């Protein structure tokens, strides 16, 4: 059995889909379906069982999980970068992760988990090194602190531990995220509603719509996850992006090209985001390449086209 926490969420559901494509259905989904609309991501997937996150955590602590767990993909977290309840964030993203990590280590079960590019925050360098890590919000801090915890354990670990610092992931099965869904999704919805796509005006030295991020298609994220699953001798913390920064304007142009209509409107940059916003990210994927991952990553033009076609299927 494979455990996927956050399995009803964006990346978790896509990992399950990728496993299903391999014929793997012996999967335990762990999530919180208090928001019942999130069932939609699971309805098209094949899994063995579902367990509420609270029950799962209690059973982890009580050593009462099913036998034969072969790997844990730990995608469950609060990923809202605007959430400032630090106690809530640390319980969900740090303490929960530590408990599950030690359960896996005690049983030599591979543990593959979601970190985040938010650990870099205000940095203008994006290497998996301490001097590059300057989180701007408590979400980024919660992910960074768990990475720090993992770093201390890695040298003595006797089973696989892999952390993925996800950059700006977009693609199928993110619709439930609301305001935290990708810019590609929101621009697509705006054009469908008869509006022009809207981007922020320039800020922090960038032109209108010129802020740049490393936008990575979720299919590529799943491929990297499964490559490490297939190579359990590889451990570490790795950036998971394309290694290529592209502007929000590039995303808007890809959406406009798909629809064949629309022109970008620029809106004022929100005061509440000033000083808390990453205007530029670009993954340094040297470490990922050094361990043997060779596949290429989709650029914005091809990734957005595939994504919008999926949304309109």
Curated annotation (Swiss-Prot):
EC no.? 5.1.3.20
Record keyword Isomerase present: yes
Q: Where is the active site?
A: 139 (proton acceptor), 177 (proton acceptor)
Which chain regions cross the lipid bilayer? none
Q: Short name of one Pfam family for this protein?
A: Epimerase
**Cofactor: binding comment:** Binds 1 NADP(+) per subunit.
- InterPro entries the UniProt entry points to: Epimerase_deHydtase, Heptose_epim, NAD(P)-bd_dom_sf
Sites where the protein binds substrate: 168, 179, 186, 200-203, 213, 277
GO BP of this protein: ADP-L-glycero-beta-D-manno-heptose biosynthetic process; carbohydrate metabolic process
Kindly list the positions annotated as binding NADP(+).
10-11, 31-32, 38, 53, 75-79, 92, 143, 169, 177
NCBIfam families, per the entry = heptose_epim, PRK11150.1
UniProt domain comment: Contains a large N-terminal NADP-binding domain, and a smaller C-terminal substrate-binding domain.
The entry's function note states:
Catalyzes the interconversion between ADP-D-glycero-beta-D-manno-heptose and ADP-L-glycero-beta-D-manno-heptose via an epimerization at carbon 6 of the heptose.
PANTHER family with a match to the protein in the record = ADP-L-GLYCERO-D-MANNO-HEPTOSE-6-EPIMERASE (PTHR43103:SF3), NUCLEOSIDE-DIPHOSPHATE-SUGAR EPIMERASE (PTHR43103)
Quaternary organization? Homopentamer.
> Family, per the entry?
Belongs to the NAD(P)-dependent epimerase/dehydratase family. HldD subfamily.
Protein name as it appears in the record: ADP-L-glycero-D-manno-heptose-6-epimerase
| Species | Marinobacter nauticus (strain ATCC 700491 / DSM 11845 / VT8)
